[in-house]
């Protein structure tokens, strides 16, 4: 077996070490939509994983909880509207950004039971009534068909949380999204370990 030793200028050695550390970091997989390597689950000190879907930087909410950005989504675009006032929540900052048009989310987590909380809000000003933001999603085999976000949230600029108990047996939490009328959209995901 041969050992390869790269020859790099001293200024790059630190960057290489940081890059190597980043590549094994559980916080963000290498590319959007790619499942992280085996054994790279990110679990906060509390055990809860908090993912902010529409931002590329971490967010600390009004309760002091830290939400980390994710590259666990396949497809989609982001929008941040920091000036919005969001009702029905104590953590409005979590709902001011969104990921929309995504098709899939896959996150490597340890096997076990979890409560998956999907955080939604209608923040796009062109959506002003029912049937304008309708999509379906599937969380580990549990299907939510014809999910009308405007109706579920009770209108625009209102937070809505869908909580789904799941049992992970293959090391991956998978959520599939299908557009029906408008784009699927999501603000954040919480993955809470259960006994």
Q: Language-model features: where?
A:
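Compositionally biased, intrinsically disordered or flexible polar/acidic segments
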Residues: 27-195
